[in-house]
Design a protein with these regions (language model features):
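Post-transcriptional modification and biogenesis factors for structured RNAs
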Residues: 1-205
Length: 205
């Protein structure tokens, strides 16, 4: 039996949407062809990601894929973090390593200081007691978010250089997320926050 679904008009109230008859196993064509329409003016958002000592190539590839999907400006790969070309990265990046600009930096501290001089807010994603809840955080764009080693996190020396620490709220008992999963949560929240600023600026014109 076919199901009828109507694409949301939340962000484009003037659009004319035709209901699409779908089988339960079919994908919604709207998501493929029109979902990016409200974001056409954004292109890349002023968000970059710094990975320091992320040991899993699969995690690195997943970061590339999330950065591509959310429209991030760049990935900075530091320490032992793997870098393209590598089959392990490609397996989860699915080609995103070719679409997202990236740089390798042996000295993350020097990179952080340079980005701060350029006006970036540097935010460490960590579980420190002084960290701000991700959903309460009011970032100052452009922003560079830092993620560290899957077990050890970010080194204290790097945490001390950051302008702010941000934590993802954890309601379960494990109090942890895979680092690449955490990356997806953070960059999409930054996309949401930046789009709100973009929409407000557009309305004010």
């Amino acid at each position: 039996m076919n199901r009828w679904r109507t694409a949301s008009t939340r962000y484009r109230p003037a659009a004319t949407i035709t209901p699409i008859a779908l089988k339960s196993t079919e994908r919604v064509p709207y998501l493929v062809t029109q979902a990016a329409a409200p974001y056409e003016g954004l292109r890349r958002i002023p968000v970059s990601v710094l990975l320091h000592d992320v040991r899993s190539l699969y995690n690195v590839g997943a970061f590339f894929r999330s950065a591509d999907a959310a429209g991030c400006e760049k990935l900075y790969l530091c320490g032992i973090t793997g870098r393209p070309p590598h089959a392990g990265i490609s397996k989860t990046a699915l080609g995103a390593e070719d679409t997202v600009p990236w740089e390798h930096h042996p000295d993350p501290a020097a990179l952080i200081l340079n980005l701060q001089r350029q006006g970036h807010e540097i935010a460490a994603v960590e579980t420190s007691i002084h960290a701000t809840d991700l959903y309460d955080w009011q970032p100052r764009f452009p922003v560079c978010v830092l993620f560290g080693h899957e077990v050890d996190g970010l080194a204290e020396a790097l945490l001390d250089l950051c302008d702010t620490h941000v934590r993802i709220p954890m309601l379960g008992r494990k109090h942890s997320l895979n680092v690449a999963t955490a990356g997806g949560v953070v960059v999409y929240e930054l996309l949401r926050k930046y789009r709100a600023l973009f929409d407000n600026a557009t309305k004010a014109r």
